[in-house]
Structures are given as structure tokens and as C-alpha cells.
Amino acid sequence: MSPPIIADTGGLLRALARTREGAPSFQDYEAALTSASVIIVPGLVLAEVDYFLRDSRAAMRKLAAEIFDPGTRYEYELPLPSDIVRALELDARFAQLNLGLVDGTVAALAERRRVYRILSTDRRDFGALRVGPRLTRPLELLP
């Protein structure tokens, strides 16, 4: 097993995407997801995933069942008030990225939990972002 990861919306959607035959559509994303010792799903990410899966309710129900099953490696993490505040600070500090609240809370959660491995399709924003007290810690983007 590899170290824990935080799942961002695009990364989680790609990791779960399947072909009509049931094979992974994005094998590298699925491998990153299935090899992680813990998959942290931020609350705002789950809400955004729900929006994108609005035409695939069965897939959303399956994902929610897996996330909330204590026997899986998923951990659902609601944003703390301090995460929201930090997300807004990061959004202001890195204004050129237009992070927004969802990506900002992913970064704030990474900072708070000290889990810097992010499953994401958003290379531009998360690649430029730095976290930590002095904003010097890069995030490790997967895959």
C-alpha cells in the first residue's frame, strides 16, 4: 500500500470511470486510488462529485456507500471552520489561480492533515500552489 491520498473531484471521477465493458477508463488514476492506504474525501469534493454524477445516480449511491462503509479505506472529512478560513486565505494569496472554495479546502485539508499527495486532474492549480506556514510545501500530484 502507498501512503494516504486526498481525492479531488476530477481525480476521483477519473479513478471511478469505467468503460462499457467495466474496465477502468483511466488505469493510472484507478491504480493511484486502489493502492492508497487511505483515501480522504473532503466533504465539498463529495458534493461536487454528486453534481457531476447527477445523471448517474446509481454510481453516486455506490460511491457514497463505499465512502461511509467503515470497512473501506475511505475517510470522509468535513471541512472545519478553520479549513474554510484557510481556503479563503489560500485563494486570496494565490489569486491568479482562482482556486475557489473546493480546491482551497482540499489544500487546507492537505496542510492540516499533512497529507500532501493529491489525486487530481488539476495540474495547473495544484501544481503552482504551496501550503504550510511559509507556503513552501508543494503538493504531490497523482498520478
Which residues fall in each region the model found?
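Short, conserved active-site loop motifs that form the nucleotide-linked donor/cofactor pocket
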Residues: 37, 73-75, 139
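Short, well-structured N-terminal submotif of metal-dependent ribonuclease cores
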Residues: 1-41, 53-65, 136
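Acidic, PIN/NYN-like endoribonuclease modules and their adjacent C-terminal/linker elements
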Residues: 2, 112-143
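Histidine- and aromatic-rich ligand-binding microenvironments
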Residues: 5-8, 41-42, 99-101, 122, ...
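Active-site neighborhoods of divalent-metal-dependent phosphate/nucleic-acid chemistry enzymes
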Residues: 75-121
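Active-site-proximal, substrate-binding regions of enzyme catalytic domains
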Residues: 44-79
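A generic structural signal for short hydrophobic patches within well-formed alpha-helices
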Residues: 12-13, 46, 126
